[in-house]
């Protein structure tokens, strides 16, 4: 799939911008805080309906305006699509999603149109960062291939907030026994779906990332990726054979068993919101024992595995967004990433300098280059790419 046109109005620091893309690699370069990442954010938002960095949608609206407009022209192997997002906060929140000029009442119909994989400097902390970062990574990946997963997440966390509110309000076990069951049922229903989907997708990524990691390290190192749910299972084989019904039964029983502990802690101690991913390199915990180079190779392998998995699920590669990460990769890792994408994956790259590409004239020849300066984009020809 290829994005051939991008329009922004009152989005971040852009008042009105229209860009056309004709080459497989699009480079946005310029000084910091000029709006390079905002362009990738706009593309990501068109694909997912959310920002990868803003907590509140209002943060995306240009100063002293009441809403923003995004449009993308998308070419896929079987069809062409016009995607539009119109927001207005003048009289409360108003958000309209359109595909080919038709408003979408079902958000999932919009989200299944375009797929993206984003790789940013924050991702380099995936291995040694917090479990929350790793959960967010896998949840974003799953939503790309199964938009209904986002529905499960929203309903799960809605039930979780209500359950935690009750745990903070009441300390009497008998009183809680009357109020908790409806929210326990919601947690179990949606939480079981989340756990099963995470296990399914992590299994696919595990196999792909292992092969890619071996290739990057010239067959000298092995990467293992394990799903670590907060629910305790007897062994891995038992977990893999779990049906939704058995999992739901175990989840509910564990919630009831942990009730006294949850009352004391005033929070829910088990569930998908406590899950984690474990990375091992040559059977050692990469978080504790992996070098910085090994950890970066792990993240690179994961991102490349994302591309391949979405290709397998959707039939074509997603769009790749590289947000100021090439300067963080050595020549070997950069080469593997660009070789994988070359000729197959439309790639948008941000950088503060064209020096990131000085060793690769071929990439420059295949690229469209835009200099970004204070919310303005100037297209450069080959002679101006300095």
UniProtKB/Swiss-Prot annotation:
Coiled-coil regions, chain positions: none
Q: Which GO terms describe its molecular function?
A: ATP binding; single-stranded DNA binding
- Gene3D superfamilies tied to this protein: P-loop containing nucleotide triphosphate hydrolases (3.40.50.300), RecF/RecN/SMC, N-terminal domain (1.20.1050.90)
Write down what this protein is called.
Answer: DNA replication and repair protein RecF
Q: Which residues bind ATP?
A: 30-37
Keyword Protease tagged: no
What Pfam families does this protein map onto?
SMC_N (PF02463)
InterPro entries hit by this protein? DNA-binding_RecF (IPR001238), DNA-binding_RecF_CS (IPR018078), P-loop_NTPase (IPR027417), RecF/RecN/SMC_N (IPR003395), RecF_2 (IPR042174)
Biological process per Gene Ontology, one example term? double-strand break repair
Recorded source organism is: Natranaerobius thermophilus (strain ATCC BAA-1301 / DSM 18059 / JW/NM-WN-LF)
The UniProt function text for this chain reads:
The RecF protein is involved in DNA metabolism; it is required for DNA replication and normal SOS inducibility. RecF binds preferentially to single-stranded, linear DNA. It also seems to bind ATP.
Would you identify the family this protein belongs to, as annotated?
A: Belongs to the RecF family.
Q: PANTHER family this protein is in?
A: DNA REPLICATION AND REPAIR PROTEIN RECF (PTHR32182:SF0)
One Gene Ontology cellular component term attached to this UniProt record is:
cytoplasm
Q: Which keywords describe this protein according to UniProt?
A: ATP-binding, Cytoplasm, DNA damage, DNA repair, DNA replication, DNA-binding, Nucleotide-binding, SOS response
List the subcellular locations. Cytoplasm
């Amino acid at each position: 799939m290829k994005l051939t046109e991008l329009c922004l109005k009152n989005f971040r620091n852009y008042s009105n911008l229209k860009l056309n893309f004709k080459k497989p690699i699009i480079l946005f370069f310029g000084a910091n805080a000029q709006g390079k990442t905002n362009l990738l954010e706009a593309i990501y938002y068109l694909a997912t309906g959310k920002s990868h960095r803003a907590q509140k949608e209002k943060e995306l609206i240009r100063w002293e305006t009441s809403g923003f407009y995004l449009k993308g022209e998308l070419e896929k192997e079987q069809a062409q699509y016009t995607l539009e997002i119109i927001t207005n906060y003048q009289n409360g929140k108003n958000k309209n999603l359109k595909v080919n000029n038709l408003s979408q009442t079902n958000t999932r119909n919009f989200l299944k149109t375009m797929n993206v994989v984003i790789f940013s400097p924050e991702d380099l902390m995936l291995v040694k960062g917090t479990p929350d970062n790793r959960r967010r990574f896998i949840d974003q990946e799953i939503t790309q291939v199964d938009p209904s997963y986002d529905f499960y997440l929203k309903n799960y966390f809605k039930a979780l907030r209500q359950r935690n509110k009750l745990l903070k309000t009441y300390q009497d076990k008998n009183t809680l026994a009357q109020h908790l069951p409806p929210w326990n049922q919601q947690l179990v229903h949606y939480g079981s779906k989340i756990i099963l989907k995470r296990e399914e997708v992590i299994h696919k990524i595990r196999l792909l990332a292992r092969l890619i990691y071996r290739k990057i390290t010239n067959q000298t190192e092995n990467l293992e990726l394990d799903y670590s749910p907060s629910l305790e299972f007897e062994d891995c084989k038992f977990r893999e054979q779990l049906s939704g019904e058995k999992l739901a039964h175990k989840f509910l029983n564990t919630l009831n068993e942990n009730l006294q502990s949850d009352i004391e802690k005033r929070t829910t101690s088990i569930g998908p919101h406590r899950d984690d991913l474990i990375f091992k390199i040559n059977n050692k915990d990469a978080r504790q024992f992996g070098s910085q180079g090994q950890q970066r190779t792990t993240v690179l392998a994961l991102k490349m595995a994302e591309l391949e998995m979405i290709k397998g699920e959707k039939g074509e590669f997603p769009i790749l967004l590289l947000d100021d990460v090439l300067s963080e990769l050595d020549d070997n890792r950069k080469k593997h990433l660009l070789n994988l994408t070359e000729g197959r994956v439309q790639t948008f790259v941000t950088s503060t300098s064209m020096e990131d590409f000085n060793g690769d004239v071929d990439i420059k020849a295949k690229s469209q280059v835009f200099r970004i300066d204070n919310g303005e984009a100037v297209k450069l020809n080959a002679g101006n790419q300095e």
